[in-house]
Regions:
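Glycine-rich beta-strand-turn "strand-cap" elements at beta-sheet edges
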Residues: 2-6, 45-65, 90-114
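Glycine/serine-rich loop-strand microenvironments at binding/catalytic pocket rims
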Residues: 2-21, 27, 111
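Short, well-ordered beta-strand segments in beta-rich or mixed alpha/beta enzyme
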Residues: 9-18, 48-86
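Extended aliphatic helical segments
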Residues: 14, 33, 71-73, 105, ...
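Short amphipathic alpha-helical segments
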Residues: 21-51, 90-92
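Residue-level signal for well-ordered alpha-helical positions
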Residues: 28, 82-85, 94
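Intrinsic disorder/low-complexity signal
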Residues: 31, 71, 77, 82, ...
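Glycine-rich loops and low-complexity Gly/Arg-rich segments
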Residues: 36-41, 72-77, 93-98
Length: 114
């Protein structure tokens, strides 16, 4: 039985930062994005969200730290509401300046879920 009565949207982004910038990225994320995630979750605009340092499955180039950013939203409207939120766009400018490479981004309508 589906967890929700509708098809959600799953978003996955691979972020890549120089090791020397990873702690600063994590600090900024915790201070600036995590409170916004919690707000969106409490308002029903996020179903789930996580930021996970990659520890297996592939070996990043020496000196880089990779993260999996995973967000599940009810649909594209909530996705766009978050992406255009002023607090997020302010954070995004800082995070993009720290990234070693452009992120890898995927999203789509969730097919199966438990």
């Amino acid at each position: 039985m589906p967890k929700y009565n509708f098809m959600s949207q799953t978003n996955t982004i691979i972020l890549r930062f120089p090791e020397g910038k990873a702690a600063e990225f994590e600090r900024l994320f915790k201070a600036e994005v995590l409170p916004l995630w919690r707000r969106f979750k409490s308002e029903g605009k996020f179903l789930a969200a996580s930021l996970t340092p990659i520890q297996g499955g592939m070996t990043p180039r020496k000196g880089l730290r990779h993260y999996i950013l995973h967000v599940e939203v009810p649909g594209m409207a909530e996705h766009e509401a978050f992406d255009s939120h002023p607090l997020f766009t302010k954070f995004l400018a800082k995070a993009q300046a720290m990234q070693a490479e452009d992120p890898l981004v995927w999203f789509g309508e969730t097919l199966f879920q438990v």
